[in-house]
Design a protein with these regions (language model features):
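C-terminal transmembrane helical hairpin of 12-TM major facilitator-type secondary transporters
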Residues: 341-388
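Glycine-rich segments within core transmembrane alpha-helices of 12-TM secondary carriers
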Residues: 175-200, 410-421
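Extracellular/periplasmic helix-loop-helix junction of adjacent transmembrane segments
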Residues: 58-91
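Cytoplasmic membrane-interface "Motif A"-like loop-to-helix N-cap segments
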Residues: 104-116, 336-348
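Extracytoplasmic gate region of multi-pass secondary transporters
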Residues: 55-56, 267-323, 417-421
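C-terminal ends and interior cores of transmembrane alpha-helices
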Residues: 68, 116-135, 348-365
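Helix-to-loop junctions at the C-terminal end of transmembrane segments
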Residues: 95-107, 326-339
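Multi-pass alpha-helical transporter architecture, strongest
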Residues: 232-239, 442-466
Length: 466
C-alpha cells in the first residue's frame, strides 16, 4: 500500500516590527553649560535692567513729567503706578504668545524674540515727549511702551529658566537655574546705579523739576539699554537648543496647542505655581518699588519718610547685595534638601519679617540704621524665596508645555503679587501706616506657603521624565 505524504499546514503571521525607540536625551558638555549660564544671566540682566529703570522712573520722574499736575503727590504717584502695573497685565499675554513658540519651535529662538520686544520698547521710552510737549499722548505712549515691556518680559523669564534647567548637570538643577535669577539683582544694580550716578553728577534733589536730570538725564538709562540688547542677542545666538526640547521634537511629542494642553492636563500645577510665586513678587515690590516711594515721600504730607532720593538709592544699592547672596545659598539648599523645605522655611521667615514693619518703619522713631536693617533683611529673604523658583516652576510641568505652563504661572502671579503690590501698599501706608503694609505681606505669604506645602517635591526627578 502506497503511503500518502502527510503535509502539515503552517499558518504564517507577519513578523511584528519593533516600535521605533524613543530618542535618548543628549548629555550636555561643561562648555555648553557655561555658554548657557552666560546667555541666560546676561539676557535676564538686560530684561530686569529695563524693568527696574522704569520702576525707578515711575517714582522719581514720570509722576511729574508724564501726567497732569495734581494737588496731591499721592494721586500723581498712583497714576504713575497705574502705568507701571500695565506691564504685569501684559506679562501673562507675553507668556502665552512666547510660550506657544517656545514649546513649538524651541527655547533659543523664542528667547531672542522676547529680548528684542522688551529692548526696543525700553529704548523708545527714552525718546518719548513729556506731557508738557504732547499732552495726553505722553502718558498714552508711555503706557503702550510699558505694555510692550511686559510682553517681552512675559516670555523672557520662563525661557531663560528652561534654557538653564534643561541643560543642567544631574543633581544641580536649582544651581543651574540660579544663574538667570541673578539677572534680577544685577539688573537692579545697573539701573539704579546709573540713576544714582546721573542724579549725583547732574545735581538733582527731591522737588527739583527744572534741572538737567528732569530735562534729559532720566532718558539716558533707557537709551543705553540698546547697547546691552545688542550684546545679549550676540551671546544668545551662540547657544544650542536644550536637549530636553530636542527629545520632544524627535519623539514627535509637541502639543498642537500648548495653551489648550496646559489647561487640559496641567491645570493643577498651573494653580500651584501661580500661588507659590505670588508671595515672592509681593515681597520684592514692597521692599523695592513701594519702599522707594515711601522712603522719599513727603514727611510733611504724611506719605513718606522724607529721605533724599540720592541717599535712598545708595541704601538700596548696598542692600541689594543681600539679594545677590541669598540666591545662590538658597539654590544650593534646594538641591541638597529639596525645594519645599527651602521655600517653606523662607516663607515662615517672611511672615515674621512682615510683623516687624511697625517697629522698623515707624515714621516717629526710624533711623537710617533701622531702615538699612529692614531693607537688607528683606533683600536676603527675597534671594532665598526667588533663587529656587527657576527650578520648582518648570519642574511642575511636562516638557511639551513647560515654556507655556511655567510662564503663565510666573506671570499671572505677577498680577496678583507685583502689579497691585505698590498700589495697595501705597494706599495702606497713606491711611494706616507701614504696619498695614506688613500685615498685607503676611497674608499673601501665608497663601504662598500653603501652595508650597501642597506641591510635589521635584528635586530628584529628571526633567525629561516629568
Amino acid at each position: 500500500m502506497k503511503g500518502r505524504a502527510m503535509t502539515t499546514s503552517v499558518e504564517h503571521h507577519p513578523t511584528p516590527q519593533p516600535a521605533a525607540p524613543a530618542a535618548q536625551i543628549r548629555e550636555t558638555t561643561p562648555e555648553e553649560r557655561r555658554r548657557v549660564r552666560l546667555a541666560s544671566t546676561i539676557g535676564t540682566t538686560i530684561e530686569f535692567y529695563d524693568f527696574y529703570a522704569y520702576a525707578t522712573a515711575a517714582v522719581a520722574v514720570f509722576p511729574f513729567l508724564f501726567f497732569p499736575k495734581s494737588e496731591s503727590s499721592t494721586v500723581a504717584l498712583l497714576s504713575s503706578f497705574a502705568t507701571f502695573g500695565l506691564a504685569f497685565i501684559a506679562r501673562p499675554l507675553g507668556s502665552v504668545l512666547f510660550g506657544h513658540f517656545g514649546d513649538k519651535i524651541g527655547r533659543k529662538a523664542t528667547l531672542v524674540g522676547a529680548l528684542l520686544t522688551m529692548g526696543i520698547a525700553t529704548f523708545v521710552i527714552g525718546l518719548l515727549p513729556t506731557y508738557a510737549q504732547a499732552g495726553i499722548w505722553a502718558p498714552a505712549l508711555l503706557a503702550l511702551m510699558r505694555f510692550c515691556q511686559g510682553l517681552g518680559l512675559g516670555g523672557e523669564w520662563s525661557g531663560a529658566a528652561l534654557l538653564s534647567t534643561e541643560t543642567a548637570a544631574k543633581g544641580r538643577r536649582a544651581w543651574a537655574g540660579m544663574w538667570p535669577q541673578l539677572g534680577a539683582p544685577f539688573g537692579f544694580l545697573l539701573a539704579n546705579g546709573l540713576f544714582l550716578i546721573l542724579v549725583t553728577v547732574l545735581g538733582h534733589t527731591s522737588g527739583d523739576f527744572e534741572g538737567a536730570f528732569m530735562a534729559w538725564g532720566w532718558r539716558v538709562p533707557f537709551l543705553l539699554s540698546i547697547v546691552m540688547v545688542i550684546i545679549g542677542l550676540w551671546v544668545r545666538l551662540q547657544v544650542e537648543e536644550t536637549p530636553v526640547f530636542q527629545q520632544v521634537e524627535q519623539n514627535d511629542q509637541k502639543a498642537a496647542s500648548p495653551l489648550a494642553e496646559v489647561f487640559k492636563t496641567a491645570w493643577k500645577p498651573l494653580i500651584q505655581g501661580t500661588f507659590i510665586m505670588v508671595g515672592c513678587y509681593t515681597l520684592f515690590y514692597i521692599v523695592t518699588t513701594w519702599f522707594l516711594s515711601y522712603g522719599i515721600g513727603s514727611a510733611e504730607e504724611g506719605v513718606g519718610l522724607g529721605i533724599a532720593y540720592p541717599t535712598f538709592l545708595k541704601l538700596q544699592l548696598v542692600c541689594i547685595f543681600g539679594f545677590m547672596l541669598g540666591i545662590p545659598v538658597a539654590a544650593h539648599l534646594a538641591d541638597t534638601y529639596g525645594r519645599r523645605p527651602t521655600l517653606g522655611l523662607t516663607s515662615v521667615a517672611i511672615i515674621v519679617y512682615g510683623l516687624c514693619f511697625k517697629w522698623l518703619l515707624n515714621p516717629e522713631t526710624f533711623t537710617m540704621v533701622s531702615l538699612g536693617i529692614f531693607l537688607f533683611i528683606g533683600m536676603i529673604l527675597m534671594g532665598f524665596i526667588f533663587g529656587p523658583m527657576s527650578a520648582i516652576l518648570p519642574e511642575l510641568f511636562p516638557s511639551n508645555v513647560r515654556y507655556t505652563g511655567s510662564g503663565i504661572a510666573y506671570n499671572v502671579s505677577s498680577i496678583l503679587g507685583a502689579a497691585i503690590a505698590p498700589f495697595i501698599a501705597t494706599a495702606l501706608s497713606s491711611n494706616y501706616g507701614p504696619k498695614a503694609v506688613g500685615y498685607y505681606l503676611v497674608v499673601v505669604t501665608a497663601i504662598s506657603l500653603v501652595a508650597i506645602l501642597t506641591a510635589p517635591e521635584t528635586k530628584d526627578q529628571e526633567m525629561h521624565e516629568i
